[in-house]
Amino acid sequence: MNELAQWLNLQTEKHIVLGYGSLLSKNSRERYSNIYTQGIPVTVSGFERAWVTRSLHEKQTYVGAISNAHSQLNAQLIPTQINPALQEREKDYQFVAVNPQDLNFHLHQGDATPSLEERLSAFTFWICETLDCEPASEEYPVHQTYIDTCMAGCLEHGGKEEAERFVAQTSLWDHPRVNDRANPKYPRAALIKSDISNNIDKLLANS
């Protein structure tokens, strides 16, 4: 039995959110959403990630998932209840069900088998699709601490290659950006060490 199958056998929640933004960060989801389960890296087909989610109340722009049959994005399986705390965090999105056949576990050895497919069918998978797509602007910029939170989660769970996937599988990087590391403005920012920030800067510079 591979790691993924073992992980699925341990889950008691039947709902699994496909976290592709700040939920990628273990630190952020634990501190702000009380989600303490370990995430599993996955690639989701049928959705494009882009800088299109405008938060009117937070005056920022976040990544969002848009239905696109020709695109894919990297994410993490996050078992959790769809509770008020999570709904508040994701209030600029709608929860959309995803077919298990659209999930690719590229970081785990072993191809999909009938037994694995059977295990996956026991869960309902959800992705947060953007309700209203608006690109970042000077009034609603992207904040560096949000980018850091997303990419630190990728580095933690999948290393440099997973962080590179986040950059490559996200559209509209040409946007107004605020470097708020000295005074974080993103309200669910992860606690990130300076060496991780430096790695993120290098990855962004090379993209």
Q: In which residue ranges do the predicted regions lie?
A:
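A glycine-rich, hydrophobic/aromatic-adjacent loop/helix-cap motif
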Residues: 1-207
